[in-house]
Amino acid sequence: MLVTSSRKPSARTRTLCKLLSRFIAGRCMTRGKMGMQELLEFAEGGPLIVIGEYHGNPGELSFYDEAGELLFSLRFTDWYSKELDSYWFSGIEPKLAGQGEIAEAFKVFFHFQRVENDKIDQLPPSSTLIVVGENDIDFMGSGKSLFKLNLRGFKKY
């Protein structure tokens, strides 16, 4: 899975690109002048996530399938925890928790193992977890929130 940026990304967008790709055990690449076909070639037959900007900050995630078809997009503001500075990403695929349309879209896109909300406490301490709520998506590692996307909109295509 490839995570990439808009054409001229800000430092914050590049940071989110790196964090998200490490968290989901994917690859990160700065887009530059590449068009969609070139990005799909770099994705090597896998899905693609493009991080868009709003006023110089990361503000949208667009999720594309292997053929380059836009499946859904999220608008958001981001937040980072101080815990992130000392966190080591294990490269293990995270688990997915949450209910609703966004959680279902994530399940179909990522194919991550789904965990019921009442079973989160039973996961091993080193687990990574994406918790999809009504208003946010929390990316957690070792039981702590590492970064969060505060949702502003969701659109399915």
From Swiss-Prot:
Keywords for the protein's UniProt record, in alphabetical order: Ribosome biogenesis
GO-annotated molecular function: rRNA binding
SUPFAM superfamilies on file: Class II aaRS ABD-related
PROSITE patterns: BRIX
GO biological process, one term: rRNA processing
UniProt keyword Glycosyltransferase, yes or no: no
Brix domain location: 1-157
Entry-linked Gene3D superfamilies: Probable brix-domain ribosomal biogenesis protein (3.40.50.10480)
UniProt cross-references to NCBIfam families, sorted A to Z: PRK00933.1-3
Role played: Probably involved in the biogenesis of the ribosome.
Protein name: Probable Brix domain-containing ribosomal biogenesis protein
